[in-house]
């Protein structure tokens, strides 16, 4: 069964997650907060890129790259679906290799329990 990533859409959801816990590394910052009274079959996650990272082409490349890695992570590791996640990208995502970013995401999401 393929797991799906659902995007956060309401600004209230973003504000709520920003009040939760935070995990940072050189590529991105992950904010996460436990969902109350929900058993999700979908992963609630959004990827945010700031305008200072570059033009729309670069920002969309970062988002595509991180979404692709997250789809791989869903298949390979046990991600906790009882949390909502907000991933804010940093400029080093564009500069470093795909495999380094992938390994970092895998280890970070295994740490979140």
PLM feature segments, named:
Residues 1-113:
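Positively charged, solvent-exposed patches that mediate nucleic-acid binding
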């Amino acid at each position: 069964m393929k797991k799906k990533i659902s995007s956060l859409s309401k600004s209230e959801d973003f504000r709520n997650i920003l009040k939760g816990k935070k995990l940072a590394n050189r590529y991105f910052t992950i904010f996460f907060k436990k969902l109350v009274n929900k058993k999700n079959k979908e992963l609630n996650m959004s990827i945010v890129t700031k305008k200072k990272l570059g033009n729309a082409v670069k920002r969309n490349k970062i988002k595509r790259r991180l979404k692709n890695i997250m789809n791989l992570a869903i298949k390979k590791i046990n991600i906790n679906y009882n949390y909502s996640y907000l991933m804010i990208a940093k400029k080093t995502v564009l500069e470093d290799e795909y495999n380094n970013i992938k390994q970092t995401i895998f280890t970070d999401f295994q740490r979140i329990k």
